[in-house]
Swiss-Prot record:
Membrane topology (UniProt): Single-pass type I membrane protein
Entry function: Plays an important role in B-cell response to antigen that acts both as a negative or positive coreceptor. Inhibits B-cell receptor (BCR) signaling in the absence of CR2 stimulation but engagement with CR2 and the BCR lead to a superior calcium response compared to CR2 and BCR costimulation. May be involved in B-cell development and differentiation in peripheral lymphoid organs and may be useful markers of B-cell stages. May have an immunoregulatory role in marginal zone B-cells. May play a role in fertilization.
Glycan-modified residues: 324, 436
Ig-like C2-type domain mapped to chain residues: 34-115, 106-199, 207-294, 296-384, 398-483
Record topological domains on the Cytoplasmic side: 518-596
Compositional bias per record (Basic and acidic residues), positions renumbered to this chain: 577-596
All ranges on the Extracellular side of the membrane: 27-496
Gene that produces this protein: Fcrl5
A Pfam cross-reference name: Ig_3
Tissue specificity remark: Preferentially expressed in marginal zone B cells.
Source organism of the structure: Mus musculus
Transmembrane segments: 497-517
Full protein name: Fc receptor-like protein 5
InterPro entries (alphabetical): Ig-like_dom, Ig-like_dom_sf, Ig-like_fold, Ig_Fc_receptor, Ig_sub, Ig_sub2
GO BP of this protein: B cell receptor signaling pathway; establishment of localization in cell; negative regulation of B cell receptor signaling pathway; negative regulation of release of sequestered calcium ion into cytosol; release of sequestered calcium ion into cytosol; single fertilization
């Protein structure tokens, strides 16, 4: 265990602290406490020598104000202790010393001893595993190295070559024990000098690390952070550690690093295996490994949320259809695919967030069907429940017709209105109107339109129309005007027509009778011997173109006892001399009663 280490290199600064530590990133950062250092880094000296104590703030910064203590009293300028600077104290008197930097907690106590013996064994105040330790056998006067002997627990230690320094490389628990040294007196035979006894107790530099996972129960595919937790000894808080992480004894990442954390972007159920970490000093003097730790990876449970615009899942042809899929409980990044039934539909998006949209600017009837989205995180696929999308065709302008085909009706007639849209998805609501007043409505689930029956009345004469609506908005038909006749108010019309026709018939009858009578009067009368004059009477010639009858007004009176004598009065007109007249006009005859 001998070597050629120089104590000035190994123990140039030995930081002695009494620290309260808190875990930070696996190592431990000292709380705000004061720190004391010794130079030279020993605790045993010969009387008359001087040791320098220096007080620092934690982190080895120079404090603004320092207080030194010995035996629970404040150290002032005394013959035994000389204050050189505010944070430095030179000591040549045995005792316990500590300091307080500014308002921090006091440092640990340092026990400094000044001996009057001829031979002393000098050792550092503390030994930690992995340290390179020097034990120096030191005499007041020069001694010959070949006369020195080191002992551990009463057993002599062999040094090659012989030296006044004993080296312990990579100190560990097997180096614990009681050490001392002896030397022969110069020019003396059989006389030995024996040093003081130093107890070496190798302290643990840091405990065995513990591996932690955050989160402790990760979800399949989610990121995980592994932390290798350990705690450096308070007096060795300036030691530098590095950390390594393993899965099934295979080194993770690019190797060991100063970070006590290792990030796994995604952990899967098949990787739920044995994990370990290792903490070691940068020079690999001390290395410790954690126990195996199995990370319980849970299967991901996808919770889908789908948002649809329009929210009713009922879309009219030509409208916008917007589908949005969001997933919780599944780690990303995710790739989203939209499916219609069993076939991939048009558009796929890859997003770092857990949202994806699928958009159809103008839907048509072929876009109807069941849709679902799929989220994939490169290892797992998660599928949402399918939801139906119904595409409706807006109704066209309806056509209003009459069953009779006539727009005129009599009061009391039964009328049937028929309203039908040639295009439109059911269910269609038809409504009938008279002069903007609703008459009734009907919902039709299939084609054929709707009918409305009503009995006409005088007040129902006017404009009729209908509307059709299947959810997008009502479409209005052209108006039909129906005229109504009231027979009780219009009898004068047929009566006047009847009278006119009757008068015409009577006029025609009178005219025909007149013609007949005139023709009858123009013929020769039947001979009557009793009434005709004798044949010897000269007869006046008769002419045509004379009035048929000239009424004579006789003056007579009837006496009851006398006989009535009928006379015939004949009037003749002179013959016209014009030769162009063809015949004689018939004689007019009028009969009258004459009194004798």
């Amino acid at each position: 265990m001998s070597g050629s280490f120089s104590p000035c290199v190994v123990f140039t600064q030995m930081w002695l602290t009494l620290l309260v530590v808190t875990p930070v990133n696996g190592q431990h950062e000292a709380a705000q406490q004061s720190v004391v250092s010794l130079q030279p880094p020993w605790t045993t000296f010969f009387r008359g020598e001087v040791v320098t104590l220096t007080c620092y703030r934690f982190g080895f910064s120079v404090p603004q104000k320092t207080k030194w203590y010995q035996k629970r009293k404040t150290v002032k300028q005394t013959p035994g202790a000389l204050v050189i600077k505010a944070h430095t104290l030179k000591v040549h008197e045995s005792g316990e010393y500590w300091c307080q930097a500014d308002s921090l907690l006091p440092s640990m106590h340092v026990n400094v001893e000044f001996s009057e013996d001829f031979l002393v064994l000098q050792a550092p105040p503390a030994v930690f595993e992995g340290d390179s330790v020097v034990l120096r056998c030191y005499a007041k006067k020069g001694i010959e190295a070949e006369t020195l002997t080191f002992y551990k627990d009463g057993k002599a230690l062999t040094l090659h070559p012989q030296s006044s320094e004993f080296y312990i490389h990579r100190a560990n628990l097997k180096d614990n024990g009681q050490y001392k040294c002896t030397s022969k007196k110069k020019w003396s035979f059989g006389s030995l000098y024996t040093s003081n006894t130093v107890v070496v107790q190798v302290q643990e530099l840091f405990p065995r690390p513990v591996l932690r996972a955050r989160p402790s129960h990760p979800i399949d595919g989610s990121p995980v952070t592994l932390t290798c937790q350990t705690q450096l000894s308070a007096q060795k808080s300036d030691a530098r550690l590095q950390f390594c992480f393993f899965r099934n004894l295979q080194l993770l990442g690019s190797g060991c690093s100063r970070s006590s954390e290792f990030h796994i972007p995604a952990i899967w159920t098949e990787e739920s295996k044995r994990y370990q970490c290792k903490a070691e000093t940068v020079n690999s003097q001390v290395s410790k490994q954690s126990t195996a730790f199995i990370i319980p990876v849970q299967r991901a449970s996808a919770r889908f949320q789908t948002h649809i615009i329009p929210a009713s899942k009922l879309v009219f042809e030509g409208q916008l259809l917007l589908l949005n899929c969001s997933v919780k409980g599944v780690p990303g990044p995710l790739k989203f695919s939209w499916y219609k039934k069993d076939m991939l539909n048009k558009e796929t998006k890859i997003l770092k967030s857990s949202n994806a949209e699928f958009k159809i600017s103008q839907v048509n009837i072929s876009d109807a069907g069941e849709y679902y989205c799929e989220a994939n995180n490169s290892r797992r696929s998660f599928v949402s429940r399918a939801f139906p999308i119904t595409i409706k065709v807006p109704v066209s302008q309806p056509v209003l017709t009459l069953s009779t085909g006539k727009t005129q009706a009599l009061e009391g007639d039964l009328m049937t209105l028929h309203c039908q849209s040639q295009r439109g998805s059911p269910c269609i609501l038809y409504e009938f109107f008279y002069e903007n007043v609703s008459l009734g409505n009907s919902s039709i689930l299939s084609g054929g339109g709707a009918y409305f029956n009503f009995s006409m009345s005088t007040e129902r004469s006017g404009n009729y129309y209908c509307t059709a609506d299947n959810g997008l908005g009502a479409q209005c038909s052209e108006a039909i005007r129906i005229s109504i006749f009231d027979m009780t108010k219009n009898r004068s019309v047929p009566m006047a027509a009847g009278i006119t026709v009757g008068l015409l018939i009577m006029a025609v009858g009178v005219f025909l009778f007149y013609c007949w009578f005139s023709r009858k009067a123009g013929g020769k009368p039947t001979s009557d011997d009793s009434r005709n004059p004798s044949d010897s009477e000269p007869q006046e010639p008769t002419y045509y173109n004379v009035p048929a009858c000239i009424e004579l007004q006789p003056v007579y009176s009837n006496e009851p006892e006398e006989n009535v004598i009928y006379t015939e009065v004949r009037r003749t007109q002179p013959r016209q001399k014009h030769a162009d007249q063809e015949s004689e006009s018939p004689r007019s005859r009028c009969q009258m009663a004459e009194k004798k």
